A protein has these predicted regions:
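Extended, compositionally simple hydrophobic/Ser/Thr-rich segments
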Residues: 66-68, 72-77, 82-112, 116-121, ...
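Short loop/turn microsegments at loop-to-beta-strand junctions
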Residues: 55-56, 61, 73-74, 92, ...
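Long amphipathic N-terminal alpha/beta scaffold segment
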Residues: 31-77
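Glycine-rich hexapeptide-repeat left-handed beta-helix
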Residues: 15-19, 104, 110-116, 120-226
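N-terminal short leaders/motifs
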Residues: 3-23, 57, 69, 75, ...
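Terminal amphipathic alpha-helical/low-complexity segments used for targeting or macromolecular assembly
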Residues: 1-51, 193, 208-226
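ABC ATPase A-loop
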Residues: 59, 77, 95, 171, ...
Length: 226
């Protein structure tokens, strides 16, 4: 079974305890609210444009920039030097690390961005975790809800794993890159340093790291390690 350590470098990060305590990596999604209730102290240290809306129960660290028309609901915690760009919509229960981007027309809810993760343009990040240095190409959607409204079941190695979650988008390991208009189906666990090509729909499942995923198949080739 994949673990949080297989996907993410979280040592010394703001949610290290939550990651360490999770039996399964997607269990962290259910810990976000409790983490914020325990640690969040609302304060605005960054810069907020007058036309942006920042509701109560939000922490913005030093160097955070919130651009015109952005809307941030609480509870939300945003780390140093991150940007919330024009028209972004953060719907609460969100933890954003340092040097991250929540981009133009991007919607985020119940999610974690580890340091340096970027969702720059027209993305949907719901009930998901982005590892360090993840970059989502424009229009990337991390779908989080099944058409039958049932629990998300992971299909991997011939097994059916009930996650216990009705809403579960994707876990993208450190360094994952997605091309424009790519989509992950509800319940995608993608290992570190994978590339997802543009216009690809990734089926539900657990994917090892250092792979290239494209619309012609689940696994095309292994990437050469840098």
């Amino acid at each position: 079974m994949v673990t949080a350590r297989d996907l993410f470098d979280f040592a010394g990060t703001f949610m290290e305890r939550e990651f360490n305590g999770a039996e399964r990596p997607w269990d962290v999604l259910g810990r976000i609210k409790a983490f914020l209730e325990e640690h969040l102290k609302p304060e605005i240290k960054g810069t907020v444009h007058p036309t942006a809306v920042v509701e109560p129960d939000v922490f913005l660290d030093e160097g955070v920039v919130v651009e015109p028309g952005a809307f941030i609901q609480g509870p939300t915690w945003i780390g140093k030097g991150s940007s919330v760009r024009q028209g972004a919509y953060i719907r609460g229960k969100t933890v954003v690390g340092a040097g991250c981007i929540v981009g133009h027309a991007t919607e985020v809810k119940n999610a974690v961005f580890l340091d340096g993760a970027k969702a720059g343009h027209f993305a949907y990040v719901g009930d998901s975790i982005l590892g360090k240095g993840v970059n989502l190409g424009a229009g990337t959607k991390l779908a989080n809800f099944k058409l039958d409204a049932g629990n998300v079941i992971l299909h991997a190695d011939g097994q059916r794993i009930d996650t216990g979650l009705r809403k579960f988008g994707a876990l993208l390991g450190n360094g994952v890159q997605t091309g424009c208009n790519s989509v992950t189906s509800p319940g995608c666990v993608v290992g570190p340093e994978c590339w997802i090509y543009a216009n690809t729909t990734v089926p539900n499942g657990i994917y090892e790291g250092h792979q290239i995923l494209c619309s012609e198949g689940r696994r095309i080739t292994s990437r050469r390690r840098r």
